[in-house]
A protein has these predicted regions:
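Cap/insert and terminal regions of metallo-dependent hydrolase folds
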Residues: 121, 128-132, 151, 236-356
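Active-site HxH/HxHxD metal-binding segment of metal-dependent hydrolases
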Residues: 120, 125-193, 206-217, 318-324
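Short, well-ordered beta-strand micro-motif
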Residues: 82-84, 197, 258-260, 357
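Zn-dependent metallo-beta-lactamase
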Residues: 3-90, 204-253, 261
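Short acidic low-complexity segments
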Residues: 115, 189-198
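Pre-active-site segment of Zn-dependent metallo-hydrolases
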Residues: 68-77, 85-121, 136-137, 144, ...
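Short hydrophobic-aromatic micro-motifs
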Residues: 96, 198-207, 267-270
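Divalent metal-coordination and catalytic microenvironments
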Residues: 83, 97, 109, 126, ...
Length: 363
């Protein structure tokens, strides 16, 4: 009773929502464009091009004819992606992850002309600061601009746990997602532990199963419990985690977001792939019933792994016949260089501000 009352108080007088589970086939969209709002790399003079049916648009400097530039895109070790999808006359927009700092996120979405008032959903892939650090500032900057009761999708209560970074070469406090800020912004916190629809165009994978050779590294630990409203409620965690003070992060709460593109297959936004990019793809396939993968974009979390492991991942991606592979964030230079040699026609380069437009067959 006390727990329920506390949750109701923190979440605007109602219990957290449950996402709409997938019943039958997933929606099919005619077009989806993915804009990298925040990432680690920037190259202002990269030339746009078309690779097969994929239109690649780089932002450049955003120059105008009448006045000199006063700012530019900000890159940092964080990730945020904006997705716009079309199905017939319908258009849907979502923002997945929020970068490391609000300065980068708010600056970049302004320059990239991403309109927060048009967002139909927010998705947080997992509870690491480099994916939610810009959220509070984004919500404060756009107070009153977002749609009423805007859904905020998460993969479970673990998203709210306070974390310590323990992976070399650094250690320290890695922050916590503040649920009270979400309540103040009048977001509808929506738990999507299982495969779920997002904005009736996209779907989340739900929690990602371990279906391949891939290993889960644990660069962070989770503190179990709530202190002054910050943290995760033990009652909402898996049974084996409830009585522990701190536990290695296994990222059971991590999820990916995907689209079923007409006549092409899945376009999968992986975020960070702590549970493996191959496992993430397999989870999206299982969630949707669609086996063909047109593109996978996001962090693949291969930077910490040895070359042999990276090669094994590339071999698996080739075996799965993914049309296009777009590494971001934590994928690592070793992966990029090896993939460039092993699958040069499938590997696409991205920078902060790059937009990938995927057209359905027959468009």
């Amino acid at each position: 009773m006390v727990f329920s009352a506390m949750m109701a108080s923190l979440l605007g007088g109602s219990k957290p929502a449950r996402a709409q589970t997938i019943a039958g086939s997933v929606p099919e969209v005619d077009r989806v464009s993915i804009r990298v709002a925040v990432d680690s790399y920037q190259f202002a003079v990269a030339a746009g091009k078309k690779v097969g049916p994929v239109d690649i648009q780089h932002f450049g400097w955003g120059l105008s004819d009448d006045k000199p530039p006063s700012r530019t895109l900000i890159s940092e070790f964080g990730l945020s992606m904006h997705a716009e999808s079309k199905r017939g006359s319908e258009t849907r927009n979502l923002l997945m992850d929020f970068g490391f700092t609000p300065e980068a996120l708010t600056n970049n979405i302004s320059l990239l002309a991403i309109d927060p008032s048009e967002l139909d959903a927010l998705v947080l892939s997992h509870g690491h600061y480099d994916h939610f650090g810009g959220l509070v500032g984004f919500l404060q900057k756009n107070k009153g601009e977002l749609k009423a009761k805007l859904p905020f999708y998460i993969g479970g209560e673990e998203c709210f746990c306070s974390r310590e970074w323990v992976g070399p070469p650094v250690r320290g406090n890695f922050g916590a997602l503040d649920r009270q800020v979400l309540e103040q912004a009048k977001l509808t916190v929506t738990y999507a532990e299982g495969p779920s629809l997002v904005g009736d165009h996209a779907f989340t994978t739900g929690q990602i199963g371990l279906r391949s050779f891939e290993k889960v590294l644990s660069p962070s630990t989770m503190k179990v419990g709530v202190d002054d409203g910050i943290g995760c409620y033990p009652d909402k965690l898996p049974q084996e985690e409830r009585t522990k003070a701190a536990i290695p992060d296994q990222f059971r709460h991590e999820l990916a977001t995907a689209y079923n593109l007409k006549g092409r297959g899945l376009v999968i936004l992986t975020a960070c792939s702590h549970r493996g990019v191959v496992n993430t793809i397999k989870q999206a396939q299982a969630a949707s019933g669609v086996t063909k993968v047109h593109a996978v974009i996001g962090g693949f979390h291969l930077a910490p792994f040895a070359e042999d492991y990276v090669r094994q991942t590339i071999a698996a991606l080739k075996e799965m016949e993914v049309d296009y592979v777009i590494p971001l964030h934590c994928s690592g230079e070793v992966f990029y260089e090896l993939a460039k040699a092993e699958m040069p026609t499938k590997l696409l380069r991205s920078y902060t501000g790059t937009r990938f437009v995927f057209e359905g067959a027959g468009a």
